[in-house]
A protein has these predicted regions:
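C-terminal structural cap/anchor segments
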Residues: 303-393
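Residues that define the transmembrane beta-barrel architecture of outer-membrane proteins
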Residues: 17, 45-51, 108-112, 145-150, ...
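Outer-membrane beta-barrel "beta-signal"
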Residues: 213, 424-444
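Transmembrane beta-strand segments that form the barrel wall of outer-membrane beta-barrel proteins
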Residues: 27-29, 125-140, 163-165, 223-236, ...
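Outer-membrane beta-barrel translocator/channel fold
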Residues: 76-78, 164-210, 218, 251-326, ...
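Transmembrane beta-strands of outer-membrane beta-barrel proteins
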Residues: 17-25, 64-68, 125, 154, ...
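Outer membrane beta-barrel
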Residues: 57-88, 99-181
Length: 444
């Protein structure tokens, strides 16, 4: 790839054309230690070490822009796909540093972003492979390569609203080998259990495309100001997700309210109910978070509830879920009748020209028992999770180091099996990520 860089300067003598390029290197180390305190000390431990190269390119001329972001990654060491002798399961997190759908491939190259856009006074229209920043479709990945989406989009402003609509025909989901149709992308991750308690067969889901619509505006209520955001995710004939976020701040205090509602569309993806993706009629979620800043530290408490209308369902590999009770290395997707409460603190400080960001949080997730497949798709026990993380940036953000530790302990009222324990509870997970911007985005 580096050999080709000189040829990208074509056209740079034209003053109306600007071409910029950049290169970033990533090293990602990860390990999960299973069976730390409980009865299953024999469970397999996992580790993985990957390195990657990211090449960025932007070409701008008049109102046109071409944007590219190519990722290459290589698994250098580890045992992410080794089967545990007791349960037959492999790793949950470490396998995400390569391709879950192609475990035989230790090296990947994905043209994650290749986007042509045109900007006018009123709107921007784009076509190709692009990123999104929704609550469920986004590039916040925690892996080597983020999720990106292929199709077209429209962004516009008017009447105090910022709006975006995207039609998506293919998805390059994180931890997979590349772009696939929406139907194939729905089927490629952990199937979990269906509403009958059997392995969920998603291989014949009919999902021709997806539509993402997002609208947001600034709001003011007396001494409070903030942001109101509405999102709609639609997969025709399968399901629709409607989400509302309201943030209001006053002085050092911030309140964040969330509401989510899901509806089954058509037959849920297949005429055979056992092969449909969305096998329930609906689901509903409520969330609230309060944070208060003291000096340079934000203290917060958050709570959320998924009620008994059904499980919250969304392809978990399409991005991080931005629920108010989110903690790194955990999801609430696949859960119903689930209450979560998280408390924590985050802060920022500088020392010796190094900028630091860090935080600690602990949360309790009260779920239905793992055997309750109607409301617990992945047989997850109730648990307490504690996260500690620390990020450092120096030399103008050219160097970035992120460290994270996660501890999960079970809170189930019933005994849990080894299969319900491995990679889920009674475990310690560590992640270390180093990113070096070898060449900041600059003009050729």
């Amino acid at each position: 790839m580096l050999i080709l860089l000189p040829f990208l300067a074509v056209g740079q003598q034209n003053d109306s054309l600007r071409v910029l390029q950049g290169i970033r290197l990533t090293s990602f180390s990860m390990t999960t230690q299973n069976g730390l305190f409980g009865p299953y000390s024999e469970l397999q431990d996992y580790y993985a070490q990957s390195s990657g190269l990211e090449y960025l390119l932007e070409a701008r001329k008049s109102n046109w822009r071409l944007k590219a972001d190519f990722y290459g990654t290589k698994l250098l060491a580890g045992n992410p796909f080794e089967k545990d002798s007791t349960t037959g399961k492999s790793s949950r997190y470490e396998s995400g540093l390569v391709a879950l759908d192609a475990p035989e491939r230790t090296a990947l190259f994905i043209p994650s972003i290749l986007e042509l856009s045109y900007r006018s006074k009123w709107a921007t229209v784009g076509l190709g492979n692009f990123s999104l920043q929704g609550s469920f479709m986004n590039a916040e990945h925690g892996r080597m390569i983020p999720s990106t989406f292929s199709g077209m989009y429209l962004k516009t402003k008017g009447l105090h609203w910022n709006m975006q609509a995207s039609i998506i025909g293919a998805i390059a989901a994180r931890s997979t080998s590349g772009f696939k149709s929406v139907s194939a992308s729905l089927a490629q991750y952990n199937p979990g259990l269906d509403t009958a308690g059997s392995k969920h067969d998603k291989t014949e889901v009919n999902a021709p495309f997806a539509v993402f619509i997002d609208a947001e505006r600034v709001v003011n209520v007396k001494n409070w100001y903030g942001q109101f955001r509405v999102e709609s995710y639609t997969i025709p004939g399968v399901f629709q997700t409607f989400m509302v976020n309201q943030k209001l701040a006053s002085g050092p205090s911030l309140i964040h309210l969330q509401y989510l509602r899901q509806f089954k569309l058509g037959n849920g993806g297949n005429e055979d109910p056992s092969k449909a993706y969305f096998q329930q009629e609906q689901s509903q979620y409520f969330g609230v978070k309060y944070s208060h800043k003291v000096d340079k530290v934000d203290y917060f408490i958050a709570s959320s509830y998924i009620d008994d209308k059904g499980k919250l369902l969304f392809p978990r590999e399409w991005g991080r879920e931005y629920l108010v009770t989110f903690q790194g290395r955990e999801r609430q997707e696949g859960m119903g009748k689930t209450l979560a409460t998280v408390v924590g603190a985050t802060g920022k400080w500088s020392q010796n020209k190094v900028r630091h960001t860090g935080g600690v949080s602990t949360g309790i997730y009260v779920r239905p028992e793992p055997i309750d497949y109607k409301y617990n798709k992945y047989a997850m026990p109730s648990n307490q999770q504690t996260n500690i993380w620390w990020k450092q940036n120096w030399k103008g953000n050219r160097h970035e180091l992120l460290s994270m530790a996660v501890i999960k302990v079970p809170l189930s009222s019933l005994p849990i099996s080894a299969a319900q324990t491995i990679n889920k509870v009674d475990m310690l997970h560590l992640s270390f990520v180093y990113r070096y911007t070898l060449m900041p985005l600059q003009r050729l």
